[in-house]
Amino acid sequence: MGDLPGSTGGGSGPAAAGNASGNASSAGNTGLGVAGTTGVDRPPSPARLSHTSEKHPKVTLTELNMLRRHRELCDVVLNVGGRKIFAHRVILSACSSYFCAMFTGELEESRQTEVTIRDIDENAMELLIDFCYTAHIIVEESNVQTLLPAACLLQLVEIQDICCEFLKRQLDPTNCLGIRAFADTHSCRELLRIADKFTQHNFQEVMESEEFLLLPVGQLVDIICSDELNVRSEEQVFNAVMSWLKYNVAERRQHLAQVLQHVRLPLLSPKFLVGTVGSDLLVRSDEACRDLVDEAKNYLLLPQERPLMQGPRTRPRKPTRRGEVLFAVGGWCSGDAIASVERFDPQTNDWKMVAPMSKRRCGVGVAVLNDLLYAVGGHDGQSYLNSIERYDPQTNQWSCDVAPTTSCRTSVGVAVLDGFLYAVGGQDGVQCLNHVERYDPKENKWSKVAPMTTRRLGVAVAVLGGFLYAIGGSDGQCPLNTVERYDPRQNKWVAVSPMSTRRKHLGCAVFNNYIYAVGGRDDCMELSSAERYNPLTNTWSPIVAMTSRRSGVGLAVVNGQLYAVGGFDGSAYLKTIEVYDPETNQWRLCGCMNYRRLGGGVGVMRAPQTENYMWCENSLKQHNNPPS
């Protein structure tokens, strides 16, 4: 319990106890205190016991409430609707800033014994006054719509919070818009935020509700302009807008352009844009709407111009949560180069054919830049190529309007660094190359950069930490295990640690901050072995071998998993793929492509924005005339 009453706090133990005992009689000690222990007389201190009652507030409130109910000592009567509510000014002022300002200021009500309160429900006021006296209230569906505005008026923050919590728990797709409007009206910011989030997340159900059809135009715009709107495709947003419009065409058609500008038309599939949006009579009859449709068509038709056309309508909505898909491009199959391209979706484990390239390409370099897939160079079975094609997954079309490389290249390495597309090494039919050039999509031009220190065909390239790595390949005489990296800031190539194995026509990818090198061919045979490079330690270390030998293999990371695609095992072209698990250090087979592919390229992209990605072959250009 600490020092005894009257002690100095400087003595303890037997000595201190003896001093106290020896001076007790001369000091007149009663036994409840110690005096004179230091030889100096001091006035005795009174005994103390501190106590705080936990019952007192509750008992006091209970008694005050009893006085109120018996109308005793009440000094104010509230006239609310047709009801008189007796109360005590001091209690109301202590609980409510509204009443405190009313009764302690210079307002006329401060001198009145009866005060009329307008614009408040009498039952809600009764509940709130009860709460002031009892600290208890029940919020339910039948009273929350009158209780919340009353609590806002009286500035009873605790009740506002309880009402908002109740409404949060009641949110569903049929009432969330009403709750949102209610929260907005009464400036309940947290409830408004929660209702907005709920509406955005459940938009696909909300758009089917009657509340949605009854929305005023301003609230509709607030909802559909959000980046957080959770939709499978922008088609759902357009359909929702048109349902809202057609609920009352006479009054709402004047708002169509105002609303349609918040639908991200450039993200629609061409088929839907032309066949549904562009052909809608209400859209066609409005000049501003036609302009929006034309803008979307231009965005789809001119992929090279997209960097200059970015804006709110071209920005994908965040919750779309599109997964990644893998494209296998060209290659060698059944004794000839092929132009076929197919797409792998890990979520369905399906390979689907997409539009083929205009040229057959084996030894093609493939990379993704600005959501477009580039196929660089290769060999068509007769000639070495310097031409390039670019694939747009939104339109399922290849375009050939990309500037060619300065040299013909097959078995070329291609990668993207700092917004530029790099073409590294390869062969031109005369010699093995150490040339490196890069493509600027804004200028549609290639420019040469510093050459590698070694000529390399069948080279693999990777980008990590702001550097471009050239890995293995062949110098035209024998396979290489050497590795060099390019620093674009210094325009210089520098050697780093070599692989443990010589590899040409290997697969390469960056995975979990390592560079993985798999398969390929050494001096004697096709390889199944694999290794990875740690840039922090500048070392290579082996990982488990693939299930098959694979030369001319594609390697890519899709949705956080490492896939090895196709290749040649020494006796047959492969269409199998396998996936690597770094935790178990194991490869497992996981399906087959439609085509066997040796020396094909692979690229990874986000799944197309629209669900009907595999749209029909009708060309957008055939429908690009402005509506009359």
Curated annotation (Swiss-Prot):
The keyword Chloroplast does not apply. Residues 74-141 form the BTB domain. It comes from Drosophila pseudoobscura pseudoobscura. Residues 1-56 are annotated as: Disordered. One of its GO terms (molecular function) is actin binding. SMART domains: BACK (SM00875), BTB (SM00225), Kelch (SM00612). Pfam families: BACK, BTB, Kelch_1. One of its GO terms (biological process) is protein ubiquitination. Residues 14-29 have a biased composition (Low complexity). Pathway: Protein modification; protein ubiquitination. This is Kelch-like protein diablo. Probable substrate-specific adapter of an E3 ubiquitin-protein ligase complex which mediates the ubiquitination and subsequent proteasomal degradation of target proteins. May have a role in synapse differentiation and growth.
